[in-house]
């Protein structure tokens, strides 16, 4: 394991500081990064295709049409980069990249973000490219998909990516839950539209692909290689990225949801860069 001293945080800062809230608004090997020079590190969002029409492959929100892949993009990554720059010794490029799995430079990014894959459509070439990326040291974080049907869509893709591998729930004693911040459970972050100051945090089943099943419990599900390295995670029944994107929604939202989202982001990024 590489020296993690550069990743140490002043933990009390994130816990107690009043936030200066942001405005809303055959694959290559993953590159080895020098933790002492992370100005080269850019967050990358996966661009992918989806099946269906309005409400499936794309949706209307806040006066525009969104493709599924761009949910929370680019504000989530921009805010995460900004916060990491303020609260840690990490320096990230503020503007995230967008890449398809078949991009020739995919290995330049040690961590890929992917959002809302509940209606995902993929090609064999994309599956093969992601397989090579993961087997060569890359890491995939998939977020914001709720219920059984949306998970099944992503799992079908991963069966082609890693045909001899099966997901399993990442236990709470795994290092990813403890690299910097301590978690006793996977936090459940609802989309801003369903967030409240108290009470339930699960999103409603009617808002998601049928059959949704039970959405009450958030989990982290992972794919591990033969040596036990965690290669990919799906944060299921939660929307961590929205906690970054919507931090300006209000101080109560920041305290209840964004703080937990940023803590999880710090833990995941720390884990990826040190394993």
Feature locations, PLM:
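Surface-exposed patches in mature extracellular/periplasmic domains of secreted proteins
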Residues: 90-100, 142-146, 165-173
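Bacterial N-terminal signal peptides
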Residues: 5-16
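Short alpha-beta junction capping motif
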Residues: 43, 111-151
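Loop/turn elements at helix/coil->beta-strand transitions in domains of secreted/extracellular proteins
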Residues: 39-41, 107-112, 136-139, 165-166, ...
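Extracytoplasmic/secreted proteins, especially bacterial periplasmic and envelope-associated proteins
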Residues: 75-79, 83, 125, 129, ...
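N-terminal secretory signal peptides that target proteins for export/translocation
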Residues: 1-2
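Aromatic-Pro/Gly-enriched surface loop or interdomain linker
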Residues: 22-111, 117-118, 239-240, 244-275
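An acidic, glycine-rich "communication" segment
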Residues: 51-59, 150-241, 245-246, 257, ...
């Amino acid at each position: 394991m590489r020296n993690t001293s550069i990743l140490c945080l002043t933990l009390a800062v994130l816990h107690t500081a009043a936030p200066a809230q942001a405005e809303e608004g055959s694959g290559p090997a993953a590159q080895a990064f020098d933790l002492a020079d992370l100005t080269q590190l850019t967050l990358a969002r996966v661009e992918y295709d989806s099946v269906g029409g309005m409400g499936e492959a794309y949706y209307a929100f806040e006066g525009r049409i969104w493709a599924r892949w761009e949910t929370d993009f680019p504000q989530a990554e921009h805010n995460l980069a900004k916060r990491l720059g303020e609260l840690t010794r990490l320096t990230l490029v503020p503007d995230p990249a967008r890449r398809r799995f078949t991009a020739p430079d995919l290995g330049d990014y040690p961590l890929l973000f992917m959002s809302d894959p509940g209606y995902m459509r993929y090609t064999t070439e994309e599956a093969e490219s992601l397989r090579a990326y993961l087997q060569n040291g890359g890491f995939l974080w998939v977020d914001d998909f709720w219920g059984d049907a949306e998970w099944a869509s992503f799992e079908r893709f991963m069966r082609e990516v890693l045909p001899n591998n099966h997901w399993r729930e990442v236990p709470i004693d795994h290092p990813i839950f403890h690299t910097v911040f301590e978690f006793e459970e996977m936090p459940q972050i609802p989309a801003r539209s369903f967030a409240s100051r108290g009470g339930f945090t699960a999103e409603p089943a009617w808002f998601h692909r049928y059959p949704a099943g039970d959405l009450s419990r958030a989990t982290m599900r992972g794919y591990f290689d033969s040596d036990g390295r965690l290669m990919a995670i799906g944060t299921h029944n939660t929307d961590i990225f929205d906690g970054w994107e919507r931090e300006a929604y209000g101080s109560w939202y920041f305290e209840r949801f964004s703080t937990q989202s940023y803590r999880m982001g710090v833990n995941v990024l720390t884990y990826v860069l040190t394993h």
